[in-house]
Amino acid sequence: MMQKLEVSERKACSVLGLNRTTKRYKSKKSDDEAVLREAIVRLASKYGRYGYRRIAAMLKSEGWKVNHKRVERIWREEGLRVPKKQKKRGRIYLRNGSCIRLKPLYQNHVWSYDCVEDKLANGRKIKCLTVIYEFTRESLAIRVERTINSKHVLDTISKLFLTRGIPEYIRSDNGSEFTEKMLRKFIEDVGAKTAYITPGSPWENGFIERFNGTLRDELLNREVFYSLEEARALIENFRREYNSVRPHSSLGYTTPLSYFLF
């Protein structure tokens, strides 16, 4: 308009009722916006159950200088799912019985184990023995079998003792695979202690229950396993990513394997 009518910027803005500052404003969006947007969509597509805060933490680990608010804005613009906010809950620790009030305070203080069931495509059941290191939330092992008994538990933890040391306590429910006399004697003989939760109180084993929920939510409910071997391979891949890739909010959005580096 200014060139066509040969008028000054001041005159043109006065006629149109515009502020000169507004006229001169240019978007200050970063030049990396498109690349960042692509990265967010890529991570959200790969890790479909992660929220924008966890994606923001992963971007930072990739070298991006970005805060969660910017990631949230792009997340919403792309129509990605933003998890609903949940009320904060106090962490539940054991208050009675053989487990007493047991809180993981340092390395190799408390491990916990439990079992998770699933099915193959043909309907046959499989069972996963999950073992975690409570202090860092690291998944130490996930053993996948048709069924799990005390011999499987003994074999799994004895191998872990050789590579990871012996914990002071191993927390579990009162399932027969964990209470068999041979297993309890072995744990006692190596210098560890069993810590059994109150029967019918899975919330007392909160660390492993939380892990099992994540395993089911992010893998078991999303995959169809056509064989035991395929289930083992995919579940082991999940375990490795859980330890080395997936940021944990309880660890300040670091991963279990990098926790001691910070």
Task: Give the location of each predicted region.
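Acidic/histidine-rich, metal-coordinating catalytic segments
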Residues: 157, 164-180, 254-257
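Short alpha-helical "recognition helix" segments of helix-turn-helix
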Residues: 10-15, 55
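RNase H-like polynucleotidyl transferase catalytic core
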Residues: 85-87, 170-174, 188-207, 223-228
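Basic, flexible linker segments flanking DNA-binding modules
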Residues: 18-110, 201, 257-261
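An active-site-proximal beta-strand-loop segment
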Residues: 109-140, 146-148
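C-terminal domain-tail junction helix/linker
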Residues: 188, 214-262
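Active-site beta-loop-alpha junctions of metal-dependent nucleic acid enzymes
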Residues: 124, 142-164, 176
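Charged, often Cys/His-bearing segments associated with DNA-binding zinc-finger transcription factors
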Residues: 1-9
